[in-house]
UniProtKB/Swiss-Prot annotation:
GO process annotations (BP): cellular response to starvation; peptide transport; protein transport
Family, per entry: Belongs to the peptide transporter carbon starvation (CstA) (TC 2.A.114) family.
Gene that encodes the chain: cstA
Lineage: Bacteria, Pseudomonadati, Campylobacterota, Epsilonproteobacteria, Campylobacterales
Protein name in the entry: Peptide transporter CstA
Keywords: Cell inner membrane, Cell membrane, Membrane, Peptide transport, Protein transport, Transmembrane, Transmembrane helix, Transport
Length: 703
């Protein structure tokens, strides 16, 4: 293709994207086809990768194809393993793409499709992809060091020490939440559990095939793995229909929680080429395959976005799906769909230890985040093609809308979104569920959206239930890969912390130390997971409200580290690349964090609904009132009921108090990183650059 034709092609892509984007932004009063959103997103991602990604890669970071990576230099056959770019892309994408891009945009859809679309597309290209890419680059230049260790090396021991503890706490919360989503999806689901279980032997076979049987034959292993995966999905439905096998593969949540912990431990201590990388690569076939099929199906089916462009009545924070104003809570809620601190832990955990060549960081780091942003766009579409009344029936709490279909329809219709009981019951029947009311959390909405689109092309209404349950399975597989990779990254983090106490424990080549660190990691997130599995109001459910804020604080810290390193590298003129998104993310997140620790304010329902401190005050007063009632009644039945209510209120009080304390600690850690970044950039704090020695690819074996 000539230079002129290339320019014409990119001008066409830019013009097409601008037209579709503009049409979505300017349309008023009428429903808009989802095709415009798909086309706008594809065009923006193409332009972002080709031009902005390349600018960051070769102007800002100056990637060097001749520089040896930690995988080549250390190559220990366990954690440091040079990995094919396509396989590593699959591993990295599978590891970072957890619950966030599926759930966040669906919840944020209560504000309308436009605010979420803007942040997912603009934030994904200019913030999230840059964040992942730059952190992967700087970790690769530092022997694959973890985020906390790099903050300690580059920004000072005290700041780094506090940050490491905060990051570890955030990591445990994130992994436990991801694991709980998987447990909820697979509990009582023999089809899902069988299919997920079968990906393990398939992945092991692929790992052995690519390393020993046919080294380097990634294409062959990919075809075999894909065929076996399709067979596993098919026979999962056969297993579910068989009374004997269905019973074997039907596990309750507490049992599944234990299985998850065991799997997380094993996957984290085995050589990365044996299970983790091939399983993540295999999962990526299904992940990207479903997203591509969804995009094509949307173009063919052309469903309308029925959600209004902007539900301005909820911008003040009075929405029924989640509390909090459009700023900052839209950005905090969307989270991983645009930018995620969890990605920094993978970009400084497993992935930098597997890079064959430094130039692969562009495709693996920047490209994977764009793929995740595309997942978020698909999730947003799944929410917005629903009738708004159905969307709010699914995502509003039963305390708000009730449990009777007629009352629910009347309540939601009074909000301005007309819906009939028949519409609710028809959809419920079509997807094979007993109810769709108050199926909060985002996952059921995504599955319903997938079913509504795919049944138009494959099978009609008769197969809508199949596509719904397939989507639930897809979500479980989608999220599980983030759990095993996250646990491995958490192990590196624990070893960094232990290494400050006893140096040999910090050696990641020390296998016994690795086993200890993995056990501590799994025990940490596993405790919260198991408690949540046996008590729907305890364990990780207590910490769930911290996920969004803590995750975004982590992203802000990572971007400030990147800014600091760019200044030390003599690239201060390019610091806007990381500093601008860092400032926006931190302003939004710290503002949200402050709202979460504000005291109770009489009459301010929105602020009180957001604040953990206010919740403590509310629950304390409730406990006092209940104790007064308890002391003034002699009815045994009423006494029993009141005591249960006191127990629940006490649990809520303790949970909110813990959240408030952790929120303050995470903000303190973030402020320390901000202060250190400012001090270093202004030359007030002198800490030398800690980049590892340059080794050429053709020389490293001689050293």
């Amino acid at each position: 293709m000539t230079q002129l034709s290339t320019k014409i092609l990119w001008l066409f892509v830019a013009a097409l994207g601008a037209i579709c984007f503009g049409y979505l932004a300017l349309q008023n009063g009428e429903s808009v086809s989802a095709i415009y959103l798909v086309v706008a997103a594809v065009c923006i991602y193409m332009i972002g990768y080709r031009f902005y990604g390349s600018f960051v890669a070769y102007k800002v970071l100056e990637l060097d194809k001749n520089r040896a990576t930690p995988a080549l230099v250390e190559n220990d056959g366990r954690d440091f393993v040079p990995t094919n770019k396509a396989v590593l892309f699959g591993h990295h994408f599978a590891a970072i793409a957890g619950a966030g891009p599926l759930v966040g945009p669906i919840l944020a859809a209560q504000m309308g499709y436009l605010p979420s679309m803007l942040w997912i597309l603009v934030g994904g290209v200019l913030a999230g992809a840059v964040h992942d890419f730059v952190v992967l680059f700087i970790s690769t230049r530092r022997k694959g060091r973890s985020l906390g260790e790099m903050i300690k090396d580059e920004m000072g021991k005290f700041t780094g020490g506090v940050a490491m503890v905060a990051i570890f706490g955030i990591m445990l919360i994130i992994i436990a939440i991801l694991a709980m989503v998987v447990v909820k999806a697979l509990a009582e689901s023999p089809w899902g559990l069988f299919t997920i279980a079968m990906t393990i032997p398939i992945a092991i076979f692929m790992g052995i095939y690519m390393r020993f049987i046919r080294p380097g034959r990634v294409g062959e292993a990919s075809i075999i793995g894909f065929v076996l995966l399709i067979l596993a999905i098919h026979y999962g439905s056969v297993i579910a229909a068989d009374p004997y096998w269905a019973k074997i593969f039907t596990l309750e949540a507490p049992t599944l929680a234990i299985v998850m912990m065991a799997y997380g431990f094993i996957a984290s201590v085995l050589p990365v080429w044996f299970l983790l990388a091939p399983r993540d690569y295999l999962s990526t076939f299904l992940k990207i395959g479903v997203i591509v099929v969804m995009a094509v199906a949307i173009v063919l089916v052309a469903p309308d976005l029925q959600m209004p462009k902007a539900n301005t009545q909820y911008f003040d924070g009075t929405g029924p799906v989640f509390a909090g104003g459009v700023f900052p809570f839209l950005f905090i809620t969307i989270a991983c769909g645009a930018i995620s601190g969890f990605h920094a832990l993978i970009s400084s955990g497993t992935t930098p230890k597997m890079l064959e060549n430094e130039t692969h960081t562009l495709a693996v780091g920047y490209g994977s985040m764009l793929a995740e942003s595309a997942v978020a766009i698909m999730a947003l579409i799944c929410a917005c093609i629903l009738h708004p009344g159905l969307y709010f029936a699914i995502n509003s709490s039963s305390a708000l809308i009730g449990t009777d279909v007629v009352n629910v329809a009347q309540t939601i219709s009074s909000w301005g979104f007309s819906i009939t009981p028949e519409e609710i019951t028809t959809l419920t029947t079509n997807i094979g569920e007993y109810t769709i009311l108050s199926r909060t959390g985002g996952a059921p909405t995504f599955a319903i959206g997938v079913a509504l689109i795919l049944h138009e092309l494959f099978g009609g209404v008769d197969l809508m239930a199949f596509w719904y349950h397939f989507a639930i399975l897809f979500e479980a597989l989608f999220i599980l890969t983030a759990v095993d990779a996250g646990t491995r990254a958490c192990r590196f983090m624990v070893q960094d912390i232990l290494g400050n106490v006893y140096k040999p424990l910090g050696d990641i080549h020390n296998y016994p130390a690795g086993l200890l660190a993995t056990a501590l990691s799994v025990a940490g997130w596993g405790y919260f997971l198991y408690q949540g599995a046996i008590d729907p109001k305890g364990g990780i459910y207590t910490l769930w409200p911290l996920f969004g804020v803590s995750n975004q604080m982590l992203a802000g810290m990572a971007l400030l580290l990147a800014t600091t390193i760019l200044v030390k590298m003599g690239k201060a003129r390019y610091t806007w690349v990381t500093l601008v998104p860092a400032v926006f993310v931190l302003v939004a997140t710290l503002y949200g964090g402050i709202q979460k620790i504000m005291p109770y304010e009489e009459g301010n329902k929105i602020a009180n609904a957001v604040s953990h401190v206010a919740a403590v005050s509310i629950q304390s007063q409730k406990i006092k009132d209940l104790e007064f009632k308890l002391n003034n009644t002699k009815d045994e039945k009423e006494i029993s009921t009141i005591r249960k209510e006191i127990s629940i209120a006490t649990q809520n009080k303790v949970g909110n108090l813990l959240n408030a304390i952790l929120c303050v600690f995470f903000m303190i850690a973030t402020l320390l990183v901000i202060i250190s970044c400012i001090g270093i950039c202004l030359g007030k704090i002198k800490i030398p650059l800690k980049e590892t020695k340059y080794i050429k690819i053709d020389e490293f074996q001689k050293i």
